Every structure is written in structure tokens, then in C-alpha cells.
Swiss-Prot record:
Name this protein carries in UniProt: ATP synthase epsilon chain
Gene name for this UniProt entry: atpC
Record keywords, A-Z: ATP synthesis, Cell inner membrane, Cell membrane, CF(1), Hydrogen ion transport, Ion transport, Membrane, Transport
Location in the cell: Cell inner membrane
Family (UniProt): Belongs to the ATPase epsilon chain family.
Function: Produces ATP from ADP in the presence of a proton gradient across the membrane.
InterPro entries on file: ATP_F1_dsu/esu_C_sf, ATP_synth_F1_dsu/esu, ATP_synth_F1_dsu/esu_N, ATPsynth_dsu/esu_N
Membrane topology: Peripheral membrane protein
GO molecular function list: ATP binding; proton-transporting ATP synthase activity, rotational mechanism
A Gene Ontology cellular-component term: plasma membrane
PANTHER family for this protein: ATP SYNTHASE DELTA/EPSILON CHAIN (PTHR13822), ATP SYNTHASE EPSILON CHAIN, CHLOROPLASTIC (PTHR13822:SF10)
Subunit-level organization: F-type ATPases have 2 components, CF(1) - the catalytic core - and CF(0) - the membrane proton channel. CF(1) has five subunits: alpha(3), beta(3), gamma(1), delta(1), epsilon(1). CF(0) has three main subunits: a, b and c.
Length: 138
């Protein structure tokens, strides 16, 4: 089976380094799938789930809050603003953060505060979708 090297790095840590057979991520233009032999590219990532199929067939689900995906002939690099494995996300805390963001939207009239609440809400929704994808694959 053909593989390529992959590194997934956040500002805090390296989450993954090894051989993969496939990576699926949420780009700004939609979902993008990377297989060995993919054309080189650089694209921005939007918040959401990233699925990585390792060379031994295991699948990892990772939440990224945004970042950059670079594809080279034998290497995929993800530089994420924030990245966490789906099983490490705390669903109850995320639901609470979503409720707080929704409440902020109701109570705010300031454009800056509304934009901050919308960003927080979008991040919470993306994290919850990542958790659902992780649970559905198990």
C-alpha cells in the first residue's frame, strides 16, 4: 500500500508524525482528501474534524481550529492554530461554551462582542461535530 509522511503540529505540540495512507480535512473551499501521489498544494484549513488513516489502517480523528495544510510529493504537513485528538475533547465543557456564546449573542449590541460570540459559537459547533464523527466511527 502506498503511503506518505505526515506531520500534524499545533502551537503547543506535535500531535502526529508518521506514515499515512489518507488524510481528509476541511479546507476553506470544502473537504479535501489527500492520498499518496496528490498534487502539491497549500491551502487554509477551517475549524473542523480532520481524519487521518494511518499506514496500518487505523483512523484518528483530530479537531483543528484552523491552520495551513501543505502537500508535497511524499509529505503532508498540517500547521494548526489549535489541534486536539477527538477523544480528548470534553463534550460537556464544549456544550457549556456553546450555550455561553449563544447567550452572548442575545445580550450584545456591540459589533466586536457579537463577532467574538460568533467565533466562539462556530468553534464550539465544529468541536461538537468532531466529537460526533469520532463517536460514529467507533
Amino acid at each position: 500500500m502506498a503511503t506518505l509522511q505526515c506531520r500534524i503540529v499545533s502551537a503547543r505540540e506535535e500531535l502526529y508524525s508518521g506514515e499515512i495512507s489518507m488524510l481528509i480535512a476541511s479546507g476553506t473551499e470544502g473537504e479535501i482528501g489527500i492520498l499518496p501521489g496528490h498534487t502539491p498544494l497549500i491551502t487554509l484549513l477551517k475549524p473542523g474534524a480532520m481524519r487521518v488513516q494511518t499506514s496500518n489502517g487505523e483512523e484518528e480523528v483530530i479537531y483543528v481550529s484552523g491552520g495551513v495544510l501543505e502537500v508535497q510529493p511524499k509529505m503532508v504537513t498540517v500547521l494548526a492554530d489549535t489541534a486536539m485528538r477527538a477523544h480528548n475533547l470534553d463534550e460537556s465543557k464544549i456544550v457549556e461554551a456553546r450555550k455561553k456564546a449563544e447567550q452572548m449573542l442575545v445580550n450584545q449590541s456591540d459589533t466586536v462582542q457579537i463577532n467574538a460570540a460568533l467565533a466562539s459559537l462556530a468553534e464550539s459547533v465544529a468541536q461538537l461535530q468532531t466529537i460526533r464523527k469520532y463517536k460514529n466511527r467507533a
